[in-house]
Swiss-Prot record:
Role, per record: High-capacity urate transporter, which may play a role in the urate reabsorption by proximal tubules. May have a residual high-affinity, low-capacity glucose and fructose transporter activity. Transports urate at rates 45- to 60-fold faster than glucose. Does not transport galactose. May mediate small uptake of adenine but not of other nucleobases.
Protein's UniProt name: Solute carrier family 2, facilitated glucose transporter member 9
Tissue specificity remark: Highly expressed in the intestine, with high expression in the jejunum and ileum, the segments of the intestine that perform the majority of urate excretion. Isoform 1: Widely expressed. Isoform 1: In kidney, expressed at low levels in proximal tubules. Isoform 2: Primarily expressed in liver and kidney; with specific expression in distal convoluted and connecting tubules of kidney.
Disulfides per UniProt: none
Disruption phenotype: Conditional knockout mice lacking Slc2a9 in enterocytes are born at the expected Mendelian rate; they show no obvious phenotype and are fertile. Mice however develop impaired enterocyte uric acid transport kinetics, hyperuricaemia, hyperuricosuria, spontaneous hypertension, dyslipidaemia and elevated body fat.
One Gene Ontology term of the molecular function aspect: urate transmembrane transporter activity
Annotated Polar residues bias: 518-538
Naturally occurring in which organism (per UniProt): Mus musculus
InterPro entries per record: GLUT, MFS_dom, MFS_sugar_transport-like, MFS_trans_sf, Sugar/inositol_transpt, Sugar_transporter_CS
Gene name as annotated: Slc2a9
Topology Cytoplasmic: residue spans: 1-34, 110-120, 171-181, 234-297, 357-362, 419-429, 481-538
């Protein structure tokens, strides 16, 4: 009896017969979500991407109080009020330095991740969050606004590390059948973080002049929760196998995350990839940019991350309060209505996580950007005609909520998933460095340039973002392959024709397949290494 017959016999024993195969398949699908896998995703995201989202929105509510703090500190030091231009500059630095810190954190990920691993990188990263929380929370009592600015920078470093290390960790611990859904947890917790920042910023909670420092101090809570919980979970099994060559540790990690004792199939798949890459060192950013086997994967990641930041979602927040005001909503009620935007974000992200393994990455990404372009165009029209009829401002509100929902249902989380899926183990840290650099530089560019675009074009600025969304959707339609339920080798093959170069692991994969069929000895991977060497990858 060959291996396929044994597998079929085992399946029939588990399900009771051929007629119950589909039932057994469904049972195995539900077993993919083990308790340890769920805890790792929730705890990892709560102490990482949640904090990123929280720090995006937390500065909005206390803005007037922080500016008053800056002015008061300046007066005590210099004996005169701060110049308005200087105050604007200080506030711009306070907001935008978060992105600079994120870029620094992204550049640190490869070095830290190589020596510490994915899980330990997340644990060490909590040190940045705790120190930032203490600095920002104590800035008012110390009478030093520089502490708030430095804290924002350190919090940016935390975000840069988190948005690279967390997707890598989730990608490497999840079965490919639920890789997209688990990866979407990153985006869901970003949205929950944004909503939490809006909620805690209400005057009834922490959004008052005497309590605004505590808005920044609560950052310490998710960091402490992650520090207390994550050590009890294993390291990424792929990291243990590829970097530490710890097969026993990798097997235990697979058993923990998959919730079953027999992980021979998963371990063999990882070992097969490990044999191909066993003599390959970690690829540098420059080497990855030069590699012909991944040229279009790199281009796609760059365009995906640039579209993620430049699609105009951040610009929506600049118009929200004015649009709500023109719709007749009292000024003191606008913060409560703004909570609806955070709620829509969270619900749309959860929806995406539920359907991503059914619909795939391509439809959600293309459809999300396409709908954003449509609603940006409609929003431009309603803002231009808002004085023509009393109901037009309400249509603007609908457009804003629709843009947010369209973004979070696809473009808001899929870029992080694709970055992990496109690249093999030795390339993944460099790929996340490239993706993170584009992400944070684009974030900084939007914060720096949007006020000038808004001043020049007014409401027509949304046509710029509509154009970017259309360009992104068009690119993904023609270039992006579906990655749902595909292995790395299959995804590489999907790009091979466009790259005009076969991925180096294909020869070894083919050889190993032939070996299993003919019971031959394991092929040497020297041909693979030669192929990498000829193309200057190693």
């Amino acid at each position: 009896m060959d291996s396929r017959e044994l597998a079929l016999a085992s399946l029939m024993c588990d399900t009771g017969g051929p007629g119950e195969l589909s039932v057994g398949h469904q049972q195995r699908r539900t077993k993919k979500w083990s308790f340890s896998l769920v805890v790792a995703a929730l705890v990892g995201a709560f102490g990482s991407s949640f904090l990123y989202g929280y720090n995006l929105s937390v500065v909005n509510a206390p803005t007037p109080y922080i500016k008053a703090f800056y002015n008061g500190t300046w007066y005590r030091r210099h004996g005169q009020p701060i110049d308005p231009d200087t105050l604007t500059l200080l506030w711009s630095v306070t907001v935008s330095i978060f992105a600079i810190g994120g870029l620094v954190g992204t550049l640190m990920v490869k070095m830290i991740g190589k020596f510490l691993g994915r899980k330990s990188t997340l644990l060490v990263n909590n040190g940045f969050a705790i120190s930032a929380a203490l600095l920002m929370a104590c800035s008012l009592r110390a009478g030093t606004f520089e502490m708030l600015i430095v804290g924002r920078f350190i919090m940016g470093v935390d975000g840069g590390i988190a948005l690279s290390a967390l997707p890598m960790y989730l990608n490497e611990i999840s079965p490919k059948e639920i890789r997209g859904s688990l990866g979407q947890v990153t985006a869901i917790f970003i949205c929950i973080g944004v909503f939490s920042g809006q909620l805690l910023g209400l005057p009834e909670l922490l959004g008052r002049e005497s309590t605004w420092p505590y808005l920044f101090g609560v950052i310490i809570v998710p960091a402490l929760v992650q520090l207390a919980s994550l050590p009890f979970l294993p390291e990424s099994p792929r990291y243990l196998l590829f970097e530490k060559h710890d097969e026993a540790g990798a097997m235990k990690a697979f058993q923990t995350f998959l919730g079953k004792a027999d992980v021979s199939q998963e371990l063999e798949e990882a070992l097969a990839e490990s044999r191909v890459q066993r003599n390959l060192r970690l690829v540098s950013v420059l080497e990855l940019l030069r590699a012909p086997f991944v040229r279009w994967q790199v281009i796609t990641v760059i365009i995906t991350m640039a579209s993620y930041q430049l699609c105009g979602l951040n610009a929506i927040w600049f118009y929200t309060n004015s649009i709500f005001g023109k719709a007749g909503i009292p000024q003191d009620k606008i913060p409560y209505i703004t909570l609806s935007t955070g709620g829509i974000e969270t619900l749309a992200a959860i929806f995406s996580g539920l359907v991503i393994e059914r619909l795939g990455r391509r439809p959600l990404l293309i459809g999300g950007f396409g709908l954003m372009a449509l609603f940006f165009g409609t929003l431009t029209a309603t803002l231009t005609l808002q004085d023509q009829a009393p109901w037009v401002p309400y249509l603007s509100i609908v457009c804003i909520l629709a843009i947010i929902a369209s973004f979070c249902s696809g473009p808001g989380g899929i870029p992080f998933i694709l970055t992990g899926e496109f690249f093999q183990q030795s390339e993944r840290p460099a790929a996340f460095m490239i993706a993170g650099t584009v992400n944070w530089l684009s974030n900084f560019a939007v914060g720096l340039l949007f006020p000038f675009i808004q001043k020049s074009l007014d409401s027509y600025c949304f046509l710029v973002f509509a154009t970017i969304c259309i360009a992104g959707a068009t690119y993904f339609y023609f270039v992006l392959p579906e990655t749902k339920n595909r292995t790395h080798a299959e995804i590489s093959q999907a790009f091979a024709k466009r790259n005009k170069a076969q991925p180096p692991e294909v020869k070894a994969d083919s050889a190993m397949t032939e070996e299993k069929a003919n019971s031959q000895t394991e092929p040497d991977s020297s041909s693979t290494l030669d192929s990498y060497g000829q193309n200057k990858i190693v």
